[in-house]
């Protein structure tokens, strides 16, 4: 799917592109390719002279190749975005190419984004940019807004983790936890631990991407300050993820402790039963041997 976003009266307007002819009629500041076809990549190559790398969304790409600037001034950034839905929480790799030097693109430049599936942060930005004039002024601000939205989405997800762990705490601290309930609790804790770890990794990734933009000296003073604010927000999120890891470990240890207590009770019952059911002749023999 190929969507382009043009800027008019301070708002972003979205158009779904289905042909090369359609693409040539617009001057977008953002071109978004979701699971692009070979033909859509060819349109980008023909119209913008930009080749989409074959490994654009490769998860195994070296860290040093995720953030770099080409000789022509194009910035390449590969960053992970969180998805927390009813399915398994996961991270989606998004490849960004920020083109600011092509004479055909004028001064606004164009941000190209390539990813395999829709990302909640992208949907949020599209909605806000349609309703709030002046939110976006150029391609660089689109990219900053996406990273800012990623930090906000991570913060919302952390709040959900707090809520879920609060429910787990009430079950664990209520006492008398059966093995069945303990298994359910451990499953819930493991899911929150995985989600918290993904958030911590994603915000670390976002920090690197924003820092790279700041070092590239492509941002004006206002955008630079916006980038610094994103980094401050991420630092705050780091503190929360660290606290949650401690809380998760405590709840997991407490739950495992209840499982051990239940097992000890069972062992004690079997021990008493085994003594009570010993054959009388064996008891008499033991009695005779000792006295």
Model feature map: region roles:
Residues 209-224, 251-262:
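Long amphipathic alpha-helical coiled-coil segments
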Residues 235-291:
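Hydrophobic alpha-helical transmembrane segments and their immediately adjacent juxtamembrane loops
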């Amino acid at each position: 799917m190929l969507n382009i976003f043009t800027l008019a009266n301070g708002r972003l307007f979205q158009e779904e592109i289905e042909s090369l002819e359609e693409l040539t009629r617009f001057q977008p500041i953002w071109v978004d390719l979701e699971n692009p076809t070979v033909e859509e990549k060819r349109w980008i190559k023909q119209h913008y002279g930009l080749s989409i790398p074959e490994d654009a969304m490769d998860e195994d790409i070296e860290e040093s190749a995720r953030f770099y600037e080409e000789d022509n001034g194009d910035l390449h950034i590969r960053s992970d975005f969180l998805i927390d839905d009813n399915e398994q929480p996961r991270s989606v790799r998004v490849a960004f190419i920020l083109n600011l030097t092509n004479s055909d693109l004028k001064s606004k430049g164009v941000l190209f984004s390539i990813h395999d599936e829709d990302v909640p942060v992208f949907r949020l930005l599209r909605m806000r940019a349609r309703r709030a004039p002046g939110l976006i002024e150029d391609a660089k601000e689109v990219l900053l807004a996406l990273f800012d939205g990623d930090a906000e989405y991570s913060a919302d997800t952390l709040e959900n983790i707090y809520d879920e762990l609060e429910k787990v705490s009430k079950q664990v601290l209520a006492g008398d936890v059966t093995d069945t309930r303990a298994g359910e609790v451990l499953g819930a804790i493991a899911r929150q631990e995985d989600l918290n770890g993904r958030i911590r990794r994603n915000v670390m990734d976002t920090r690197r991407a924003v820092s790279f933009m700041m070092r590239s000296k492509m941002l004006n003073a206002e955008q630079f300050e916006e980038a610094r604010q994103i980094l401050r927000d991420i630092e705050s999120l780091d503190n929360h993820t660290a606290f949650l890891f401690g809380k998760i470990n405590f709840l997991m240890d407490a739950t495992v402790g209840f499982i051990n207590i239940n097992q000890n009770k069972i062992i004690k019952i079997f021990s008493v039963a085994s003594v009570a059911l010993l054959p009388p002749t064996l008891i008499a023999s033991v009695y005779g041997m000792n006295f």
